[in-house]
Structures are given as C-alpha cells and as structure tokens.
From Swiss-Prot:
It is found in: Nucleus; Chromosome. It comes from Rattus tunneyi (Tunney's rat). Residues 43-74 have a biased composition (Basic residues). Its main location: nucleus. The lineage of its organism: Eukaryota, Metazoa, Chordata, Craniata, Vertebrata. The modification Phosphoserine is found at residues 8, 10. The gene is Prm2. This is Protamine-2. GO terms for molecular function: DNA binding. GO terms for biological process: chromosome condensation; nucleus organization; spermatid development; spermatogenesis.
Length: 105
C-alpha cells in the first residue's frame, strides 16, 4: 500500500517539496500573480464558474425583463393560424417600456 504525502499550504500544486525557494521570492505578490488571477472566475477553457446571484441582482434582472418580454396569455380565439372568434381589438398596443419607446422614435 502506498501512502501519499500531504501537501503543505505554502506549497503550490505544481511544486514539489524542494522547490519552495520560488514562493519565498514572490512574497506578497503571489495573490496578484497573473496566472492566479485567471483562476478567480473561470474554469477550464474559459467557461465561467457558476455563481449564485444575490437576491438584489435577481430582483433587478426580473424587473428589467418584465415589461416587454413577458408572455401574455391569449384567449382561445387568438391563435396564429386561423383567427376566428372575437375581432374586437384590431389595433395592437405598443409596449410602453423605455427601451421600446426609444426604438420607435
């Protein structure tokens, strides 16, 4: 049975036990090392690590999308192919959100 040696916290994953002299030279710069910055928000091949959104952010996103992207429930006579039934409202009302109003003018 082979026993694996535990790595000390000062050792980086790519260093062996005899290569500690490089980490001493870097000192405090280890946190700001460009190679380590890459690992902060990303994983393999540039895919971004999933992070849970805060409630504040979720609320903001939900509020922003709500105006014109919300799917409206149509009654049974509002079908795309065969428009039979009530023809009361022929004019379609425009969305009044800021984004849509800006596109109209």
């Amino acid at each position: 049975m082979v026993r694996y040696r535990m790595r000390s916290p000062s050792e980086s994953p790519h260093q062996g036990p005899g290569q500690d002299h490089e980490s001493e030279e870097q000192g405090q710069g280890q946190e700001l090392n460009p190679e380590r910055v890459e690992d902060y928000g990303r994983t393999h091949r540039g895919h971004h690590r999933h992070r849970r959104c805060s409630r504040k952010r979720l609320h903001r996103i939900h509020k922003r999308r709500r105006s014109c992207r919300r799917r409206r429930r149509h009654s049974c006579c509002h079908r795309r192919r065969h428009r039979r039934g009530c023809r009361r409202s022929r004019r379609r009302r425009r969305c009044r959100c800021r984004k849509c109003r800006r596109q109209c003018h």
